[in-house]
Regions:
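C-terminal transmembrane helical hairpin of 12-TM major facilitator-type secondary transporters
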Residues: 115-158
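Loop-to-transmembrane helix entry/capping segments in MFS-fold secondary transporters
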Residues: 83-84, 166-180, 207-208
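Pair of pore-lining "gating" transmembrane helices in MFS-fold secondary transporters
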Residues: 46-70, 146
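Short amphipathic helix-loop junctions that connect adjacent transmembrane helices
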Residues: 69-86
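Helix-to-loop junctions at the C-terminal end of transmembrane segments
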Residues: 100-114
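Multi-pass alpha-helical transporter architecture, strongest
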Residues: 11-17, 215-254, 260-261
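Juxtamembrane intracellular "pre-TM" segments in multi-pass secondary transporters
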Residues: 19-56, 78, 242-261
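A membrane-interface helix-boundary motif in multi-pass transporters
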Residues: 1-4, 82, 195-221
């Protein structure tokens, strides 16, 4: 109920307070057929690269639920952590995430560029997950939070690349589609990760391995990196890549690819 209230307040604040970010010449008329998740995705199919890049981002968000959905269970099972230690650990993760996404990312991503930030970030993120999976001492979980949180540079960089693949008039449509897909991962991710934890800590499991969700998360992040690399490399080699009408909008060197009519 409280969450619903905050969501409503957020919507009202956005509607009445936040200014329109697009210039008048970049706006378009409201259409009901596009004002829904399915409609947004259908309209964006004219940009073929988006499917692979959105898939890459979806894998990142599913992988993130390895920590979000099972952190408490895993550390109680493995290290018998108390409520105090669990709360402290999550607080440390929160502070580190805030430092990376609220500060470091402003220096790291411009230096590396969006594309390289995606690869480096996902590699570090995957390494952090893998380390969590096989940690056998409590202190290791705190140390391995560093690469895990540093991997947070990948998500914004990937979203920046996605934004660079559509013109300014379709940015809202893109963000709506991304929000819908990310919301779906909040259903799929917890279900997959908690089920995996439950199975590998049950008496019927071939081996007791509470870190299985982190291992799966690490693999998903590697697949995400490979998928992003494949899509972005294809863009550079295919002839139907045209310069973006708004250079520097976030894509690779301002590239946008549209399907032939």
């Amino acid at each position: 109920l409280v969450s619903a209230g905050f969501t409503l307040l957020n919507a009202l604040y956005g509607f009445f307070v936040l200014p329109e970010s697009l210039k008048k010449e970049n706006r378009r008329n409201f259409e009901w057929k596009k004002a829904n998740p399915v409609g947004s995705l259908v309209q964006l199919k004219k940009y073929p690269s988006l499917a692979g890049l959105i898939g890459s981002l979806v894998l990142v968000y599913i992988a993130a639920h390895a920590l979000q959905s099972t952190w408490t269970f895993i550390n109680i099972d493995r290290f018998q952590w108390s409520k105090k230690t669990l709360g402290l650990s999550l607080g440390v993760v929160g502070v580190m995430t805030m430092i990376v996404q609220g500060g470091l990312i402003r220096f790291i991503n411009p230096k590396l560029g969006n594309e390289r930030s995606v690869y480096v970030g996902l590699a570090i993120y995957s390494a952090g997950m893998l380390a969590f999976a096989f940690a056998n001492q409590s202190w290791m979980m705190f140390v391995f939070m560093i690469p895990y949180c540093l991997g947070g540079i990948a998500g914004p960089a990937l979203q920046g690349i996605l934004s660079g693949h559509v013109p300014p008039t379709e940015q809202g449509e893109l963000q709506g589609a991304l929000t819908s897909m990310i919301s779906l991962t909040s259903i799929v991710g917890p279900l997959v990760m908690t089920s995996l934890f439950s199975y590998f800590t049950s008496p019927t499991a071939p081996v007791h391995f509470s870190g299985a969700p982190f291992l799966l998360g690490s693999v998903l992040l590697l697949i995400s990196a490979i998928l992003a690399y494949y899509v972005l490399r294809q863009e550079k080699t295919e002839p139907n890549v045209e310069p973006n009408i708004e250079p520097g909008f976030g894509g690779i060197k301002g590239f946008v690819r549209e399907a032939p009519e």
